[in-house]
Structures are given as structure tokens and as C-alpha cells.
Amino acid sequence: MQFIDQARIAVKAGRGGDGICAFRREKYVPAGGPSGGDGGRGGDVVLQADSNLQTLLDFKYKRLFQADDGRRGGPNRSTGASANTLLIRVPCGTEVRDLGTDLLLGDLTDNGEQLMIATGGKGGLGNAHYLSNRNRAPEKFTEGKDGEERELQLELKLLAEVGLVGLPNAGKSTLISVLSAARPKIADYPFTTLVPNLGVVRRPSGDGTVFADIPGLIAGAAQGAGLGHDFLRHIERTRVLIHLVDGSSPDPIADAQVLLGELEAYGNGLLERPRLLVLSKSELLDEEQLEALPAQLSDTLGQPVQVISAVTGQGLDGLLQQVWQELGVSS
């Protein structure tokens, strides 16, 4: 399935039905009064979060959504039928913004959560409303009102508590595949991961925590280089970041500094949240490197460094314990 995390759509609520002009015509009522009924209300447009959806792909092929109009009134003061609400389903984690005003209308995070985005027009009034002592046979009636129209920007931000970040080939996909049941594509070339991958990591208690593997970032990602700008938004909701540094890289310290620079450039508080610094691929390092690299990284970045290998399992239990501690959950 193609992963689409941004979409623009236009929505239009239904128009209210017109009121009508009508008079009673019963056989034994020779001077029948006005009996024109009111029009029905136009259909509203509502967005609803659906946990079964993972992408905004559907909106790539359909971008105009229009609710039905209300029905016109009838004789004998009968009100026209109101139109049904048009329900548009979106993935949990979808932010909705009005393109005309740039206002954030809502953030649908919980399954079943709804957001009214366009209200249907009111029905017009039939001539029965205009009966008075002065006018016993009014012919006045009103048309239904137009429904609201909006152009919307939909933006999906994944609902993960832990985000894995690092330069291409830092070992993020391998790590998430070992820790969870996720099976991302893994290969030895940059940008193997082209979309974010989610995996649920189970704690001994049986509860699950969602990890997100964010596609590899490169220098300039915050300004749109590589794949990073498209996917940095997906770590905005995370509570903890795992910063993976490839220990087999020619210059792991420079790699770590590049990624920190991108997080800082993107902003939105990414540098302020808890971040675990992890040196990966320890199985590829000799004893001298295993002793020197963690100390150099720690001295340069000013924080502790954990050493892991997703291949041998070294350090994984300790890493998870730190994650649970940062999240404030029991292991």
C-alpha cells in the first residue's frame, strides 16, 4: 500500500431545501389557508478517525466531497426531508487545517473521534409561516441556505510513543524488526526505508508500546533534502527518541552531530524531549573501537551512550529498560 501522509480536499455541505407556496384545497374548505411547508436541512460534513486506516491514500484519487441537499417542502405544511451527514473517515493522528484561514480545526487522535467541518444549510420557510391578520393568503416563501464550503489540508502524524531516528543505514529497521513483529524492508543501501514503519514492542507485563522507524535523515533534511522533511513530522508526537549512530560509519561523531543539527533546525521541541544516544552495529567493531567510540561520542555530545547490536542482541534489554523508565511505565 502506498503511504500518503498529506492531502488537500474540498468539502461542501448540502444546501437547505426550499420552502414552497401552497394552499389548502380540501373539498369542504373553500377558503383554504396557506399550507406551504419548510425545506429540509442540508447534510453536514464530518470527519471521523478510524484506527483501521493507516494512510491518506484515498484522498489522492478523490478530493471533492459534497453532502446531499435537503428536500423542498411539501403541501399541508409538510417539511422536506433533511439530508444525511456525509461521514469522511481518516486515520487516527490526522490534523485538519482550514486552507483559507490557516486555522487548525482539529486533531483526530482517538478511534471514533469526530470533527464537524462544514454545516449544512438551513431549509427555507414555506408560505404558511407568513400568515397574518393582514395577509390571509401570503405567497411569500424563502429558499434554502447554502451549506458551508471549505478547503482543507489533512496531515497525518503517526501515533508512536518512541521514535527511532538516525542517518541512512544506522540500523533502525533492523532494530525495530528485532524488538517487534514489524518486518520493514532491510538492505545495505541508503533510503531502504521509504516510509515510516510502526512496530509494537511488548513489555513483560504484556502491554505494548508503539515504536516508529523514521526514514533516514541527511544533512539539510529540515529544509527538504532527502526524505527527512516529509517524515520529521511523524516524530512530533513521540515522547522518547532513540538516536541511532552507526558504529561502523567512517565518522560516527560527525553523523551524530548532523542529526542533532537537523532536529534543532526542524524545531517543534524535538531537541527538548528525552533522547537516548545509541551506538549501533557493535558486532562490526573491534575491541579498541568498542572502548574508544562510546567515550568519544559521550564527551562530544555530553550524554551517556549505550552500545547495542540488533544482530547479536547485545545491549537491547538495557536499552528497553531505559525506554520504559523515560516513559514512566513498568517493564
UniProtKB/Swiss-Prot annotation:
Belongs to which family? Belongs to the TRAFAC class OBG-HflX-like GTPase superfamily. OBG GTPase family.
State the protein's name. GTPase Obg
Q: Tell me what organism the protein belongs to.
A: Synechococcus sp. (strain RCC307)
User: Which gene underlies this protein?
Assistant: obg
Q: Which UniProt keywords apply?
A: Cytoplasm, GTP-binding, Hydrolase, Magnesium, Metal-binding, Nucleotide-binding
| Annotated SUPFAM superfamilies | Obg GTP-binding protein N-terminal domain, P-loop containing nucleoside triphosphate hydrolases
Quote the subunit structure annotation.
Monomer.
Where does the record place the Obg domain? 1-159
Q: Name one GO molecular function term.
A: magnesium ion binding
What top-level branch of life does the organism fall under?
Bacteria
HAMAP family, per database record: GTPase_Obg
What Gene3D superfamilies does the record tag this protein with?
A: GTP1/OBG domain (2.70.210.12), P-loop containing nucleotide triphosphate hydrolases (3.40.50.300)
Cite the binding residues for GTP. Answer: 166-173, 191-195, 213-216, 280-283, 309-311
